[in-house]
Amino acid sequence: MSHGLLIGLVASCATLNPETVTSNRMLPLVLYNFARSLDLSQKYEEGAKVARCGKEACIKYGHYQVLHSCLEIEAECDFFLGKKEESVERYREAFYICKVMGYEDDLQIIRTEAEKYLNILF
């Protein structure tokens, strides 16, 4: 299945049955998992785009459990696309969300990546 088709299916999921999306937190989680898969496959342009969609879905539907993860994926993809300023900003946003929420494991992942890629110390 092509990535474009999968993105279309996920997007239509939100328009066809929005109450399922909002009550089950399905759309942000699906978009996060898809963005992660694209990032790990080194498809950074697509990964960043899907991660941004995941971020927007988190905000739109008020389900923030994967917001920091979408930001981290977007940051990493932006770094590999040469968008260092955007990457710094996304890592910073992800870091502070994790800090406020007490997500210590994810906080360490973000610290490690930001230092490795951009020499940023949080």
Regions found by a protein language model. Give the residues of each.
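Amphipathic alpha-helical segments of tetratricopeptide repeats
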Residues: L9-E19, R52-H63, E93-Y103
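Single-residue signature of alpha-solenoid repeat helices
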Residues: S2-L5, G47, S87
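Residue register of alpha-helical TPR repeats
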Residues: T22, L29, S69, E89, ...
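"A position-specific structural signal for the A-helix of alpha-solenoid helical repeats
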Residues: M26, N33, V66, I73, ...
